[in-house]
């Protein structure tokens, strides 16, 4: 009886030794950067300069994490929001905006309040809007 159990344990251990490295190797190939990156010109737009319909859309979604695009005849607006934050002092950094592999990539980071920075205990909704010439590619957000 003990031999049967020990034999099953050995089989399971050998299977794990084979399966684990295979799983680990395939996990590394997940998110690949495009080979042909091309920078895209953009402008960070203030709320006052947005189309009214886009302002309303942002206002209705600001309390949740938001990734959206809005296109007019001439421009594409790319909107990213990080939802509700309990204090002031947050900003959004644009790391890169580029095209590659038939997509527009938007690489952003949320920057929290600096250590020791005075903050107000008030709900804030960090949102950034990037305006660029009209684009047809799908958008990939890296947030």
Predicted regions located by residue number:
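Exposed, flexible binding/inhibitory loops of compact, secreted disulfide-stabilized domains
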Residues: 2-16, 21-143
């Amino acid at each position: 009886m003990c031999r049967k159990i020990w034999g099953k344990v050995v089989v399971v251990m050998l299977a794990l030794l084979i399966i684990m490295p295979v799983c680990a190797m395939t996990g590394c190939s997940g998110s690949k950067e495009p080979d042909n990156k091309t920078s895209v010109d953009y402008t960070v737009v203030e709320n006052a300069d947005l189309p009214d319909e886009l302002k309303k859309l942002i206002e209705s979604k600001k309390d949740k994490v938001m990734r959206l695009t809005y296109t007019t005849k001439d421009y594409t607006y790319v909107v990213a929001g990080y939802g509700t934050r309990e204090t002031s002092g947050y900003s959004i950094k644009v790391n890169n905006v580029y095209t590659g592999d038939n997509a527009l990539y938007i690489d952003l980071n949320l920057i929290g309040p600096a250590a020791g920075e005075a903050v107000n205990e008030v709900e804030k909704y960090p949102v950034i809007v990037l305006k660029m010439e009209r684009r047809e590619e799908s958008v990939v957000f890296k947030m």
